């Protein structure tokens, strides 16, 4: 009886510890532990996935006044921490915040961590997690507040959520160009809007991995759906290839860094045929392609040093006005 009583007392004593819950988020930080408040400037990075582009992170660190650099993601690890710290040795700190649920996104500690960041990077992953977990939470609110005066960027899924119109990828797999041209309302094409409030990216839908994964056809379907949703009568798209990043300053002027190209699509109006279970017809969508020697002005939608042409989908068949017929 005494032994049983002793065991019960031990269990009672341990109850608070057993009841203590693990935080719904995970946080890793390297560098200084104290907060700093340097002068910052706004800027947006749209990175096309694949190997990260060093120059893009260095640009962000400069705009952040070498303050606290924060990576946010829904899954994954802290692999960015040593990489960014090496690129930006003067940065006060580099941290990764994993926010895997709405509960985590509503945690006051998550909000406090984000509030103290001078630069925010949205890692690649699954953009449906970002829109499902973070929409309507302090994560979204603080992210948009930071966009107004701080550098913010994203790669792959992180790129997707920074444009006004978002391919939300709610299905189990991403849509391919062949699927999208054959049926622009196929179940893999899902969309949301207004997750991020970036002035230069209003009226635009974005796409990464562009050339590498042959996404021109699906981007025409994106534009058709944006118009069909009533979101824009002449929709626009920005697409960035892998190992490449578009750097947009606070005035809406963009340069490109990395190894490949970026594309700026302008539809002349709604698609001629944009219907469920029907091949897409969308004629004469304008394309401006730039490499690292070109620039782009989002205020007047014009590029310098660009190659300009049109692409069309006719009954689901993609064609281009370029010599040789390449869509890219």
Q: What are these language model-derived features?
A:
Residues 4-13:
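Sec-dependent N-terminal signal peptides
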Residues 15-19:
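Sec/Tat signal peptide C-region and signal peptidase I cleavage site
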Residues 123-124, 146-166:
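Catalytic nucleophile loop
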